[in-house]
């Protein structure tokens, strides 16, 4: 009785396992281990033979599909039926129905192309034209203001025929230019004026550089050329902090009004 109960429970367990694996492996029942199920040892051997087929690690294909290679490379699958798959030159709204067919042709032609190099399309050794993906440039959002970063704006370099004279004219303000011209005119009136013109200009340039450096080191830089650099006193704090003299007529008016009211009440 115990053996019959054990064999019955084993047969029931095997039936459940085989029912679960019926759709997975058809050759498991046809193996030699599962032909004779009368003894317990044959039952365990059949279970061991069918157990690897029930593991979740092996793909579940009907028949012997796992032993055959795939007919199509899954990496070649391109979602050409979606409009965002490719951004080609032929993909435009005005193309209509012909644009979809051309896009599919581009997709089918570009399936066999390998990864593109970073430097762009290169000519092939056999002289053939590059594919549609090789000739396509990277999509850059230049029509947006954040698409292409704008570098620092550079001012144009001014080139003058007279080197030292025009450099000094650009470097110094108007009063320095007037002083330099006056000194040069005075030096030109002397007997050796034309001969010492170059030396005098060099000396004037050095002197003006020293004066500009001294003025720069005198105190903090004040933006007087801007309207907010140093506002007038009557405009500070929105005009509320004004002097007492400007309020004198208003105070006099109030005093006269108070005196008039007191005089009328006294009468």
From Swiss-Prot:
Keyword Isomerase applies: no
Stored InterPro entries: Mcrtin_ACTH_cent, Melanocortin_N, Opioid_neuropept, PMOC, POMC-derived_peptides
PTM-bearing positions, type Glutamic acid 1-amide: 134
Ranges of Basic and acidic residues composition bias in the record: 121-145, 222-237
PANTHER family: PRO-OPIOMELANOCORTIN
Name the UniProt record assigns to this protein: Pro-opiomelanocortin
Keywords annotated in UniProt: Acetylation, Amidation, Cleavage on pair of basic residues, Disulfide bond, Endorphin, Glycoprotein, Hormone, Obesity, Phosphoprotein, Secreted, Signal
Tissue-specificity statement: ACTH and MSH are produced by the pituitary gland.
Family: Belongs to the POMC family.
Molecular functions (GO terms): G protein-coupled receptor binding; hormone activity; signaling receptor binding; type 1 melanocortin receptor binding; type 3 melanocortin receptor binding; type 4 melanocortin receptor binding
One GO cellular component, as annotated: secretory granule lumen
Glycosylation sites: 71, 91
Disulphide bond pairs: 28-50
Domain of life: Eukaryota
Modification Phosphoserine, positions: 168
Positions carrying Valine amide: 150
Signal peptide: 1-26
Region (Disordered): 88-175, 181-200, 222-241
GO biological process annotation, one example: negative regulation of tumor necrosis factor production
Residues annotated with Phenylalanine amide modification: 87
Pfam families named in the record: ACTH_domain, NPP, Op_neuropeptide
Disease cited in the entry: Obesity: A condition characterized by an increase of body weight beyond the limitation of skeletal and physical requirements, as the result of excessive accumulation of body fat. Obesity, early-onset, with adrenal insufficiency and red hair: An autosomal recessive disorder characterized by early-onset obesity due to severe hyperphagia, pigmentary abnormalities, mainly pale skin and red hair, and secondary hypocortisolism.
N-acetylserine carried by residues: 138
Species this protein is from: Homo sapiens (Human)
Localization per Swiss-Prot or TrEMBL: Secreted
């Amino acid at each position: 009785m115990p053996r019959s109960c054990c064999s019955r429970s084993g047969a029931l367990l095997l039936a459940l396992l085989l029912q679960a694996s019926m759709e997975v492996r058809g050759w498991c029942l046809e193996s030699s281990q599962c032909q004779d199920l009368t003894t317990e040892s044959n039952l365990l051997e059949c279970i061991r033979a069918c157990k690897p087929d029930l593991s979740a690690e092996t793909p579940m294909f009907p028949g012997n599909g796992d032993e055959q290679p795939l007919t199509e490379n899954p990496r070649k699958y391109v979602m050409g039926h979606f409009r965002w798959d490719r951004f080609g030159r032929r993909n435009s709204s005005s193309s209509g129905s012909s644009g979809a067919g051309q896009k599919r042709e581009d997709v089918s032609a570009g399936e066999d192309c390998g990864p593109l190099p970073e430097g762009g399309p290169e000519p092939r050794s056999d002289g053939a034209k590059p594919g549609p993906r090789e000739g396509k440039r990277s999509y850059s959002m230049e029509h947006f203001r954040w698409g292409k970063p704008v570098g620092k704006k550079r001012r144009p370099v001014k080139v003058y025929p007279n080197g030292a004279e025009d450099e000094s004219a650009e470097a110094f303000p108007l009063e320095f230019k007037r002083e330099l011209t006056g000194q040069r005119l005075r030096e030109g009136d002397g007997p050796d004026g034309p001969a010492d013109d170059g030396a005098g200009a060099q000396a004037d340039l050095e002197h003006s550089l020293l004066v500009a450096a001294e003025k720069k080191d005198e105190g903090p830089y004040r933006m007087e050329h801007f309207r907010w650099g140093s506002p007038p006193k009557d405009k500070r704090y929105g005009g509320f902090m004004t002097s007492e003299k400007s309020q004198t007529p208003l105070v006099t008016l109030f005093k006269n009004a108070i005196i008039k009211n007191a005089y009328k009440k006294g009468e």
